[in-house]
Amino acid sequence: MSNFLECKTSVLPLNRVGVELVSTQSRTGLNSSPTLPILCFNLVAISLLVLFFQGVIMANQLKSLFPQKAKDFEKSDQAKIFDRKNLYDYLDGGAELYLAYDFQRLVVQDYKSGETSITVEVYSMETSQDAFGLYSLDQEGEDVQIGDRATYGSGLLKFWKGNYLVRITDMSGNDRFIEAILDLGKNISQNIAPKGKPPELLAKLPADGLVPHSERFFHKQIILNNLYFLSTENLLNLNEKTSAVMGDYLLGKMNLKLLLISYPDTSIAKYAFENFCNRYLKTSLSGNRVIQKVEEGKFAGAELDKKNLWLTFESRDEKATGNFLRNLKKR
Amino acid sequence: MTRKEKISFSRRDFLKGTTLTTLGVALGLVSPEVLSSQETKKERVVIVRDKNVQDADFKVDKNIFSKLLDTGMSNLGGDNDPTKVWKKLFSSKDIVGIKISQMMTPTHKELVELIFSNLLKAGVNDKNIYIWDRDRVGIGSAEMHSLPKSLGYAKDHFSNVIKKSTALINVPGMKSHWLAGAAFSIKNWAGAVDNAVEYHTEDCCSSFGALVANPEIKSKCRLIILDGLRPLFNGGPQVDPKYLWSYNGVILGFDHVAVDTVALKIIQNKRDEYKKEKWVLNPPPLHIALADTRYKAGTSDLNKIELIKSGWQEGVLI
C-alpha cells in the first residue's frame, strides 16, 4: 500500500492551495467585502480539485493492489484507468453491465512473459453487495479459495472481495498459466483488506433445491433480460431502487427459476405485481397469488408479499408451483 | 420509423413465434416451414473455412488465410478470379473506409492486411484507404494497425471517415453480446457514431437496424466480411475464454441482415451443441430481425438467403 500512503501526503498541498486561493483574493483588495460569485467560484474550484485528487487517490489505491510479478509474468505497460464516464472506451457495449451496478473505477494491468500475456481487471464498486452482484452473474468454473468467493476455469479467474470484482484472463482458454493466474489472484486478494458482505436479500432464497452457484443479485431490467429475457418493456418496474435475487431450483423432478424482487414500498410492489399479471400473464387478478399456464406447457407464478414480489418461471407442475410459492411466504 | 420508437415484445411473443418469426427460426424455436417459400431473388451469403488457418496457439497462417479469402470473394462475386470481384466492387476513384472492431474480440490484423492488399490490387490508392474503429483512424497501409489519427464526427453523429468515403467495407468480429444478444455486422456500426450509448438500450438494443438503413451506410457499404476465426458464443463483449471456439472461417455478403442471420444461426447452434440442449441467447438479438421488418435493411429470412459453403465442412453448424 505504499502508493496509497504516498498519495495521501500529496493531498495536503491541495488543501493549502485551496486556502491560498481564498487568502490571495483578500490580499488583492478585490474582496475587502467578498462577493458571492467569487466565493462560489472558489468553492467550486476547491470542490473540483478535491474531487480530482480523490480520484487520483482512488486510482492509486487500485494500482497499489497489483504485485510487480507473478511466476514468470511481470507488469508490462502502464495500468489503464477508467471511471463511469469513460468505461465505454474499454468496454463499448459492455459498460452498461457495470453501470447497472454502482461501478466506480476500473484498473486494467497487463502482465507479460515473453510474447504471452495475462490481463488483470480490478473493478471497484460503491458497495460490496454490488461487487457480489457482478460476480454472481457468471459463477461457472471450479471453486478456488481466493477472496470472498472465486471460480477458475479455462484461463479465467474471477473473484469477489470487499467492494472489488477481479478478473484475471489468459485468452488462450487453456490452463497453461494457471499457477501464475492463481498466484496473481492471491496477491491481489491479500492487498484488499476488508471482506465483503453479501446482499441480505440473498438469505431469503430457500436453500432446499437451490442449484449451487445459480444465485444472482441485481437491480435493473437489463440484467434480468440477460439472465432471463422477459420483455423489452420494464414490466416489473425494476430500477436502481429495487433489489432482486434469482436462483435456479431442482425440486424432485421439477426445475424452476425463482425471482424475488424487493421494492421500496408496498404500493410500488403492488403496481408491479398487477402490471406483470395483466400484461405478461394476461390474466385477471384474484388475490395475491397467480399461477398461469404459458407457452411450452410451462407455468409462471407470482406472489405478492408486502414489499416483496416472488415470481417463478419454467415450472411444468401447476400444483407444485403453488405449494412452492405458498411456502415462500412463510419465510 | 424513427430510431427511438419503442418495441413491445415479450418472452411469450418470442416463444409463440407469431412476431419476428424469422428470429424464432434462426434460434431454432420455430419451424422454418412457417416462412414463405415464394421464389424471390435471394441474398447471397458465403461461408469459407479452413481447418489450418490458425494453429493451436491461434497464430494465423496468412497464406492459408489469403487463399480462404480469395475463395470467399470468388464465390460471392461468381467469378473464378477474386481480383476481378474486388475490381467490380472498388476502383481507383474510390476512397474506401474499412470499419473494423477493436473491442475484446477484435478483427484479426491479418484480415485487415489482406483486405488492404486486395484493394491495392483493385487500383485503390493507398492513401485513399481509411481504417478505423470509433475515432481511431489510420490512413494508408503505414497506419493500418496503429490507427493514430482522430477525424471526429459530423453533426448527424456519423464518423467523418464515413463522410469522406465513397465506399465502405464492414469487417466486424463475431460474438454473442450480453445486452444486444449478438454482435455481428449490424452492431459494428455502433462503433461509427458518437452517440452509440443511445442504441445500447434496455429493449435489447432494438434500434441498431436504423444505422444500416441510414443512406450514409446503406448506399456506401459494398462488402461485409465477418471475421469468424475465433468467435464468442456466450457472454460478450467481455470474454470468458471457454466460450471462444475455432470456427476458422469468414462469412461474406452484401446484405447486413442476411449475413447476421447466418452468423446468428451458427452461434445458436454452437450454444445448443455446447449444452447438449436448447440454450437460447439471452436476450434475443431482436435487432437483427427488426433490421428487416422495421428498417427494411435486408432479409432475415433464411429461405431468402442463398448460402454457399466451401472449405472445411466439419462443424460448419449451418
What is the predicted role of each segment?
Chain A
Residues M1-V50:
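Intrinsic disorder/low-complexity segments
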Residues F53-R331:
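Soluble, non-membrane globular domain cores that form compact, hydrophobic packing
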